[in-house]
UniProtKB/Swiss-Prot annotation:
It comes from the Bacteria. Residues 337-398 form the S4 RNA-binding domain. SUPFAM superfamilies: Alpha-L RNA-binding motif, Nucleotidylyl transferase. A motif ('HIGH' region) lies at residues 42-51. NCBIfam families: tyrS. One of its GO terms (molecular function) is RNA binding. This is Tyrosine--tRNA ligase. It holds the Pfam family S4. It catalyses: tRNA(Tyr) + L-tyrosine + ATP = L-tyrosyl-tRNA(Tyr) + AMP + diphosphate + H(+). Keywords: Aminoacyl-tRNA synthetase, ATP-binding, Cytoplasm, Ligase, Nucleotide-binding, Protein biosynthesis, RNA-binding. Gene3D superfamilies: HUPs, RNA-binding S4 domain, Tyrosyl-Transfer RNA Synthetase. Its EC number is 6.1.1.1.
Length: 399
């Protein structure tokens, strides 16, 4: 395998789509550091693991010797990215944006090498563009082209409002690539239209068009929806080590492999070996421990990871749980099953009303943590430990 082939294999690991691969190969063969861009609008103060999918890929480019440009979209955050949205997003204040941007810079260097990272703010060129420049930029795209975007098309067809400033967002993101002379831009699959606008604007400016690497959107703890703070299915990178560790241990066995592919720095061949070992009978919980330790160590320290493991074992394995916990199978189906129904079907209560009452009294624990939300839905393909009161336990296989 040549150096370029090996580099391409690492770059494509976990990626959903690469446009255009032949162009990227040509850039890699030029034997110069590529300018690799990824933009983050500081719309919330903290990053979660879903954001780190792009950061991890940026780290891969750094390991290959390329220059990473971490773009803080302080200007575009005032517009609000309409990608995947069915309504106009409320704008943030300048003060909110700047404070969020400050915390982003503190957090990204838990993954990125600061010596190989260029922090950029798109206000530095967008604000100097001026009204005349913005009009010239807007003239390069038509309303018809904008309505090719799926989210805009759906809103237009449904009679929902689309504000004029929302059309400016993909143009501004695309212009960032012109200003930064990007060779490669990374983004989520929901960003495809915006990323391709960057290629078009670069061509218009007589630049070589950037290659576009799209990464999948990371599923949250429920294994169904995109990781999101609004859905409560996220793992924040500033959370306590114990919280991060426990949340990773709670994911389904099938979701574990997705997290390994997108969040772990373990080599692909090693992950393939883990899969084979699980198929051969190894307990997947052992591998979740490896993953949880790796993630905690990345955002805290190796010592914190060891402490989190010790805490987890103390709560779930060493003397806290009886040795003879019965194992029961509960069919939950594709849509999951509310926790109170799982409690009842596991035989831990005589009725669903009793299960609900026990949850309200704080007497139900899931993997050692008190269940606060009686509407919590458990997904299939995982094994959980349920406890009701002090003496009732069950290891529940959800399928």
């Amino acid at each position: 395998m040549t150096d370029v082939q090996a580099a391409l294999e690492l770059i494509k690991r976990g990626a959903e789509e690469l446009l255009v691969e032949a162009e990227l190969v040509e850039k890699l063969e030029s034997d110069r550091p590529l300018r690799v861009k990824a933009g983050f609008d500081p719309t919330a103060p903290d990053l979660h693991l879903g954001h780190t999918v792009l950061l991890n890929k940026l780290r891969h480019f750094q390991e290959l010797g390329h220059q990473v440009m971490f773009l803080v979209g302080d200007f575009t955050a005032m517009i609000g990215d309409p990608s995947g949205k069915n309504a106009t997003r409320p704008p943030l204040s300048r003060e909110q944006i700047l404070e969020n941007a400050r915390t982003y810079q503190e957090q990204v260097f838990k993954i990125l090498d600061p010596d190989k990272t260029e922090i950029c703010f798109n206000s530095s060129w967008m604000e100097s563009l001026g009204t005349a420049g913005m009009i010239r930029l807007a003239s390069r795209y038509t309303v018809a082209r904008m309505l090719e975007r799926d989210d805009f098309a759906k809103r237009y067809a449904g009679g929902q409002a689309i504000a004029i400033h929302e059309f400016l967002y993909p143009l501004c993101q695309g212009y960032d690539s012109v200003a930064m002379r990007a060779d490669v831009e990374l983004g989520g699959t929901d960003q495809k239209f915006n990323l391709l606008v960057g290629r078009e604007l670069q061509k218009h400016d007589r630049q070589a068009p950037q290659c576009v690497l799209m990464m999948p959107l990371l599923e949250g703890l429920d294994g169904v929806n995109k990781m999101s703070k609004s859905l409560g299915n996220y793992i924040g990178i500033t959370e306590a080590p114990r919280e991060i560790f426990g949340k990773i241990m709670s994911i389904s066995d099938s979701l574990m492999w997705r997290y390994f592919d997108l969040l772990s720095f373990h080599p692909a061949v090693e992950i393939a070996r883990y899969r084979a070992e699980v198929e051969g009978g190894r307990n997947p919980r052992e591998l979740k421990v490896l993953l949880a330790q790796e993630i905690v160590a990345r955002f805290h320290s190796h010592a914190a990871a060891e402490d989190a493991l010790a805490d987890f074992e103390a709560r779930f394995q060493r003397g806290v749980l009886p040795d003879d916990i019965p194992e029961v199978n509960v069919v939950v189906g594709d849509g999951g099953l509310p926790v109170f129904q799982v409690v009842k079907q596991a035989g831990l209560t005589g009725s669903t009303s009793e299960a609900l009452r026990m949850i309200e009294q704080g007497a139900v624990r899931l993997n050692g943590e008190r269940v606060e939300d009686k509407g919590l839905v458990l997904q299939r393909d995982q094994t959980v430990v349920l406890q009701v009161g002090k003496r009732k336990f069950a290891s529940v296989v959800l399928n």
